[in-house]
Structure formats: C-alpha cells, structure tokens
Amino acid sequence: MLLLPLPLLLFLLCSRAEAGEIIGGTECKPHSRPYMAYLEIVTSNGPSKFCGGFLIRRNFVLTAAHCAGRSITVTLGAHNITEEEDTWQKLEVIKQFRHPKYNTSTLHHDIMLLKLKEKASLTLAVGTLPFPSQFNFVPPGRMCRVAGWGRTGVLKPGSDTLQEVKLRLMDPQACSHFRDFDHNLQLCVGNPRKTKSAFKGDSGGPLLCAGVAQGIVSYGRSDAKPPAVFTRISHYRPWINQILQAN
C-alpha cells in the first residue's frame, strides 16, 4: 500500500485540508474560514507546489513540515485562488521553522512554523485560529472539520475554491495499517466506512474541533481512502511557544 504526504495525496476536505482538495466535502461560504492560508512553494529542484496552512499570529502561519521549500508565498483572505480579490493579502515568508526532529521516512513531527515578512492586517476575511494547550487531549469519536484547496478526487485537479468536510476522530487502532503511526504524536482521522477525506493539496491545513485547531493534515493512502494521519498539535505546544517567544 502506497503512502503519500498530503501534498501528494488527495483527501476529503470540508473538515480538513492538504495540498490538494477535499473529497466528499462542500464549498465553504466565501471568507467564512478567515484563518486559512494558501501556500505557494518553490522547491529546491525548481517545480512549484502548494499546501494549506493557518494563521496563528499576525506574523506566523502553522503548516506541515513536508510543505517546506526554497521560498514560500502566503495568500490570506482567499476563497477562489484563481480570482484575486481586495480581501487578499500576499505575504512573503522570511523564515521557515521546520521541526528539528522531522523525519521524511516516517513523517513523524510533520509540523512547521512560517514567519511572515510583514504582519497580516486582521479583517473580516483574515483572522487567527486558536490552537490547544499541551495537555489538551481530544477524544476519539469527536466530529471535526478540515478545509483546503486540495483535490476533490484521486484523479481530479485541485479545487479553485475553498472546500470543507466533516471528519470523525478515530481510535488509534483504525490507523494500525500505517506502520509508523504514533498516537502520541498523531491523530487518526476519518471513518473508513465513509468516502470523505483530505487529499493532495490539503497538506498543512488545520483539523478544527470545537473551534480549536487540533491537527495538521499530514498523510494518507494513495487512493485517498480514510482514515488519514494528522499531526497532533497539542504535543508540540512547548516547541511552538519557544519559536514564537524567540521570534
């Protein structure tokens, strides 16, 4: 079974996002998710890719470590990423803080902070999203949401408009087929009996549970069948705090 990071996978997004689109989701009401960030990434070998992310401070975006690149431009306040609006704020990333223990083989510690060159202006279309404390443990069974511009199907292109999908947090056993899944570091998301998921292009987007970002779209199966694996944000709160305080 082939496993791919979300920028290479297509997941069902109306509740979570990757670097593609949401599968089994619906289009969000324009600008109803003001924390969402669209990342245009220039890679070291030339080709561009894109990911999702979310604004946690006026000058910091949280995303997945596998979304790192030679340079990154962040677009805030977007709904249709092909039609520029007055709500858009395009900001350059001046520093990428990829977690020092990020492992490209296991995709453990798939989390990264992006420092923006300028602070975002908070508007009706651009806002920050709260994230959990270190010991905030969200239980299996909870319904959450993920959003993104990723693929809406395995063989479909990315979505122009922001999509969202509702996904259920699963027991860790549901992700036992992922050899490197670690319940302490990650969340298992998406009912395997449903056809909803996040996929390629949704990577880096937030898993929103009761208004709090609990997870980050990380990886899943190459056929986009749920469940998928999300980075557990609460585990990394001390590291996040350290970066924010030092910068």
Curated annotation (Swiss-Prot):
Location in the cell reads: Secreted; Cytoplasmic granule
Q: What is its EC number?
A: 3.4.21.39
**Catalytic residue positions:** 66, 110, 203
Biological function: Major secreted protease of mast cells with suspected roles in vasoactive peptide generation, extracellular matrix degradation, and regulation of gland secretion.
Q: Which SUPFAM superfamilies match?
A: Trypsin-like serine proteases (SSF50494)
In the UniProt record, what gene is named as encoding this protein?
CMA1
Q: Hey, what's the signal peptide range on this chain?
A: 1-19
Catalysis: reaction(s): Preferential cleavage: Phe-|-Xaa > Tyr-|-Xaa > Trp-|-Xaa > Leu-|-Xaa
Record-annotated disulphide pairs:
51-67, 144-209, 175-188
- Keywords in alphabetical order: Disulfide bond, Glycoprotein, Hydrolase, Protease, Secreted, Serine protease, Signal, Zymogen
Location of the Peptidase S1 domain: 22-245
Gene Ontology, cellular component aspect: collagen-containing extracellular matrix; cytoplasmic ribonucleoprotein granule; cytosol; extracellular region; extracellular space; secretory granule
Q: In which tissues is it expressed?
A: Mast cells in lung, heart, skin and placenta. Expressed in both normal skin and in urticaria pigmentosa lesions.
Instruction: Say yes or no: keyword Lipoprotein present.
Output: no
Which BP terms in the Gene Ontology apply to this protein? Answer: angiotensin maturation; basement membrane disassembly; cellular response to glucose stimulus; cytokine precursor processing; extracellular matrix disassembly; midbrain development; peptide metabolic process; positive regulation of angiogenesis
Q: Which residues are propeptide?
A: 20-21
One GO molecular-function annotation for this sequence? endopeptidase activity
- The highest taxon in the source lineage is Eukaryota
**Pfam families tied to this protein:** Trypsin
Sugar-modified residues: 80, 103
Q: What is this protein called?
A: Chymase
Family assignment?
A: Belongs to the peptidase S1 family. Granzyme subfamily.
